[in-house]
């Protein structure tokens, strides 16, 4: 699996260099899909990832994907992914400060969707 993850990250880097954040995000999600939400499972350093818990790695990768979705103006996808992070922090970590930050992030993306819709309707 290590070679696969390294390949995924090299593709992500290539697509980011080509300014294709939508494709980079889709590719990075392939790594995310390999991970669960286990806080006790410690993962070794791999590709661009330091040694960390499976939970922390998935959060970090999701955060990268959300940033790429934002660059690609895929705010609906970002909203869904932020919602999953919010749910995990609410149910599994009881980190309500982080939950509040995720809700603010979702609100920001909803405002971007609204602004884009208003712009389209005004055209």
Regions found by a protein language model. Give the residues of each.
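Nucleo/cytoplasmic regulatory scaffolds in medium-to-very-large eukaryotic proteins
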Residues: 1-123
